[in-house]
Regions:
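SAM-dependent methyltransferase catalytic region
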Residues: 1-224
Length: 224
């Protein structure tokens, strides 16, 4: 069960209850307490960045009559095994016209006209086509994401193996002692430490997500 169940919930208590429920369903005499921390966690399963990319050509195109660019495209999902191509840029480095979309709401436009104007003035240059220099920077950033992603996946795989509880099944009766819960939690803490690959990736993705929910009263602080 610890190898095949995955889940996420906004409520940490619901996550803990799920762990207890799973444990009660697989418990047997002399069994160890299963450890689900790397597979059941608290978070938002509906909002977030994904491993999807835009093509370099879409970023260069100037949007106009009969011409589409990245603002009209849906980013393509990449396969972790095959990886990302050199002409592809991760979508969480790319702006979207839906970010800070308060100017689409008639009520808010009537209540906060100055802030809405600030957002509209910000969005126009923010969503322009990219220059060649900017695309080179985006490529370097995407390459760095590849490195961080590989590092995190390797670290997680090592932790999964280190925290695995082997169950002896006849005729193979070799019994190995697994790590105690406290030791597993310490290794998990190291995986998510402030300077880890995971935290660096999360910071980039959280920044992109924040632009969709930017508080209108701070419209003047929107990044350029």
């Amino acid at each position: 069960a610890t190898h095949n169940c995955y889940g996420v919930d906004l409520n940490p208590t619901a996550v803990d209850l799920a762990k207890v429920s799973m444990w009660l369903n697989i418990i047997y005499k002399h069994s160890k307490t299963p450890w689900f921390n790397l597979r059941l966690s608290s978070g938002n399963s509906l909002i977030g960045a994904r491993l999807q990319v835009f093509k370099e050509a879409d970023l260069k195109s100037k949007r106009g009559r009969g011409v589409e660019n990245y603002l009209d495209r849906v980013p393509e999902r990449i396969n972790l095994i095959n990886g990302r191509h050199d002409d592809e840029i991760y979508h969480f480095f790319i702006p979207d016209v839906g970010m800070a979309g308060f100017d689409k709401d008639k009520v808010i436009k009537g209540l906060l006209p100055d802030e809405v104007k600030t957002i509209k003035d910000w969005r126009k240059p923010f969503t322009e086509e990219f220059t060649y220099a900017q695309i080179r920077t985006l490529k370097r950033l995407s390459n760095k994401v590849d490195e961080l992603l590989t590092s995190h996946l390797n670290n997680r795989e090592r932790l999964l193996k280190a925290t695995d509880d082997n169950i002896p099944i006849w005729p193979n009766s070799n019994k190995t002692e697994g790590l105690p819960i406290k030791a597993k939690e310490l290794q998990e803490k190291d995986l998510y430490r402030a300077t880890s690959a995971y935290r660096k990736l999360k910071l980039m993705m959280d920044y992109w997500c924040s632009l969709w929910f930017w508080p209108i009263e701070k419209a003047g602080d929107l990044p350029t």
